[in-house]
Amino acid sequence: MVSDSLKICTVCAANNNRSMESHKQLKDAGYNVRSFGTGSAVRLPGPSVDKPNVYEFGTPYDDIYRDLTSQEYHKMYESNGLIRMINRNRHIKRAPEKWHNNASAGKFDLVITCEERCFDLVLDDLMVRLVNKDQADTEIKQAVHIINIDIKDDYENAVIGGKGILKLVNMIHEFRNTNKQRRLDHDFDDESDTILEDQMMKLLAKWQQEHTHLPTLYSVAYY
């Protein structure tokens, strides 16, 4: 585990391809990471465009794997990479999880979405949570950085996008460590570890120079 890792979350629609590939890369690098989907259900390619394979969130990847490999179309799923994707997922965590049901996961420092619609849904949900928060709750609001990195939903682009996400998280982590060391060196005890909005925007701008193929959006929300 990376020392002093941010609590990170990756999000796509079905929590199967883009968010899971970036989850894997961040996990392999030692970061504290979870992943979720914003869709109403887990929709995966089927024998035709109008016949997807649909599962409820929480259906174990092992069950999805067994179902797909038992179908008469399993050769198609092998050739289009679907079986490979589910096999990868079941070695990362138990089942796809829905973003809107993740209150028990606690608060994240950084949420990275992989599609603009997911970005909007995450922001909307966090706003609803804040509005519905118990008025008697005096807990200090915690900022969460929401970054969207637009990734095409196929296996190859998910790998490319995952590498880009890992690079960005490495930059953010290095920035935090440098700031922390500076405070220790100069006894700046009154400064917090929180990355400010303008600091994050500068990091994103620097990252974007090397990742022009991955458009980004950025916002800050609160718990």
UniProtKB/Swiss-Prot annotation:
Main location, first listed in the record: nucleus
A Pfam family per the record: Ssu72
Reactions it catalyzes: O-phospho-L-seryl-[protein] + H2O = L-seryl-[protein] + phosphate; O-phospho-L-threonyl-[protein] + H2O = L-threonyl-[protein] + phosphate
Assembly: Component of the cleavage and polyadenylation factor (CPF) complex.
Functional description taken from the UniProt entry: Processively dephosphorylates Ser-5 of the heptad repeats YSPTSPS in the C-terminal domain of the largest RNA polymerase II subunit (RPB1).
Name this polypeptide is given: RNA polymerase II subunit A C-terminal domain phosphatase SSU72
EC number: 3.1.3.16
PANTHER family given in the database record: RNA POLYMERASE II SUBUNIT A C-TERMINAL DOMAIN PHOSPHATASE
Gene giving rise to this polypeptide: SSU72
GO molecular function: protein tyrosine phosphatase activity; RNA polymerase II CTD heptapeptide repeat S5 phosphatase activity
Transmembrane segments: none
